[in-house]
């Protein structure tokens, strides 16, 4: 059988190949056409529909906004004397990411051109852990003109190194104003997070510092101001070609205080070498006239970051100079509490102005053997309320306080703002402890029920300002001012005016009364007259009444730090200094329309009469010199303008804290069991 084979013809093969070629060519053409169509459509979209957007983007790559930080507002005293100011200087700064080669090599070169100290290097290394590598980190602040010139001549060979003009903050009176002015510091991550949370981050573009404490923190928004900016054009390399527009910043407002710095200087002089606090208030306005917490510190150390050595010296010093004793020191008020107890006894009807009761040398709760002793072993015989205040009888108040009880007497004491913040324009004021059964139950919740419950005997020491009582010197001055002003309550305040230089506007802090206590005028008159007798013969502060050229009311107070066992006598010489009694004195003057109310505490200062001369000295200076125009001396700055020359610590009469032996922790409360309660419960 023969096999038939198909034999293709050349013509047929060519036709097939040509047909396939045409199909492929058409497909390629269509594909290319489609691509060009897409490109054309995209081109039209970009050129026509997205033109404005890309034009704006191109401009943004070329045009930048550079923020301009506002100048921080100044703080001045009542006469315009500057207490916190600004001054310009050059700062040597490094951008680590732009350094060519090793950073240490660059620093070594800079050390040949400027006096870069070990402290400068320590601060720089600390900042490196807090700043990003592309941020400017200060290596040396406040270059001298010669240093700036030498470095400027070498900048071409030092990439990543800049000299920038900065505005620096300064506190010319140093430690005299540290605890109420506070200080500013560099903006931290915590600060930035808080600003972002409050949606205020945009206000701090270009700013490097923020208020950290005191008035600098409380009035941060007013002092800081609003930033401006420069709109500039840059080339492809980021260099500024020209400035297109400038919007100036709105500088911060100036704070004007109610205080005369001369009175503050006198208060600091009186407290020199002593631990404690002194605060004075104008009862007619609430304006703070003097504010001393001693020992103090140099706030200029904190502005650009305190070095570790100085921080350790301050933080570990046994005298605790960083504590603001005026608003955060908690102490039992001792017998300075008695005038306010007297108002409670009179207003409640427990006694009258003519009531006379025994005031023996010791008293016991009926049915018990424990004796509560008077400071005078022989007692005071029989006494009315006026005499009990004049001679400071303890047993008089023991008995009446116990009989009345804490729940009945507490509302009257609360009217004087004991156990509450006064509302002063400073951050972190402690509210103190005005005890109650509810307070004790909550505070000692981890103790057995029988120890948590209120014991009626606890009212006995509370009646004379001991026990769980714990108040700040500011609270005592505020209560004294309220009593002196017949129950008219003003909020204590440091700032009396805000000066806005941008708007040419002055805002007054209007001293309107917060409220008026619902107490009888006759009772105010009676208690104030009794306080005047404290300075007269027979009174506990009779020595400072000698030669007094104006009328004054006052009350001494001796606050126990440790309890004395039954049958034992108090012997200060046998006690460690930190266990000795605190000395208190409160006062107001003159009796008619008082102009000043004062509270003084000397830690471990002994009898209350030891604090009285300080109040007399401050009152004399205010009423006889300042108010009469007798002192025209111009206050002198404590240091020069650019160098920190003050010692680290001041006011304590001691050597630098780094040379002090660290001893026992700062004590404020006499009762070991109540100490921790006041510290935690009294804070905000």
Go through each PLM region and give its residues:
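Periplasmic/cell-envelope proteins involved in peptidoglycan metabolism and beta-lactam response
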Residues: 1-308, 330, 350-358, 407-417, ...
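Beta-lactam-recognizing serine transpeptidase/beta-lactamase-like catalytic domain environment
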Residues: 2-12, 84, 234-246, 284-336, ...
